[in-house]
Swiss-Prot record:
<comment type="similarity">
    <text>Belongs to the Cren7 family.</text>
</comment>
<keyword id="KW-0963">Cytoplasm</keyword>
<comment type="function">
    <text>A chromatin protein, binds double-stranded DNA without sequence specificity. Constrains negative DNA supercoils.</text>
</comment>
<keyword id="KW-0488">Methylation</keyword>
<comment type="subunit">
    <text>Monomer.</text>
</comment>
<protein>
    <recommendedName>
        <fullName>Chromatin protein Cren7</fullName>
    </recommendedName>
</protein>
<dbReference type="InterPro" id="IPR020906">
    <property type="entry name" value="dsDNA-bd_Cren7"/>
</dbReference>
<keyword id="KW-0158">Chromosome</keyword>
<dbReference type="Pfam" id="PF11520">
    <property type="entry name" value="Cren7"/>
</dbReference>
<dbReference type="InterPro" id="IPR038647">
    <property type="entry name" value="Cren7_sf"/>
</dbReference>
<dbReference type="GO" id="GO:0005694">
    <property type="term" value="C:chromosome"/>
</dbReference>
<keyword id="KW-0238">DNA-binding</keyword>
<dbReference type="GO" id="GO:0003690">
    <property type="term" value="F:double-stranded DNA binding"/>
</dbReference>
<dbReference type="GO" id="GO:0005737">
    <property type="term" value="C:cytoplasm"/>
</dbReference>
Length: 61
């Protein structure tokens, strides 16, 4: 089952940057699916202060 990660790149998500919730679009997104388990879509976000963080932004059934 192929997942289109492009659809995740166009949405904004709430992420926590230095204790504040900020709405950001991911810089990059990829699928993380360990063997024998359901997968998740991980997004890479760049906070306004320069920090980068990862967050699960979707589930694969």
């Amino acid at each position: 089952m192929a997942v289109n990660v492009q659809q995740y790149l166009n949405k904004e998500y709430e992420v926590e940057c230095d204790g504040q919730m900020v709405r950001l679009k991911p810089v990059k997104a990829w699928v993380l699916q360990p063997k024998g388990r359901k997968g998740v879509v991980i997004g890479l976000f760049k906070c306004p202060n320069g920090k980068t963080l990862r967050k699960a932004i979707g589930k694969i059934e």
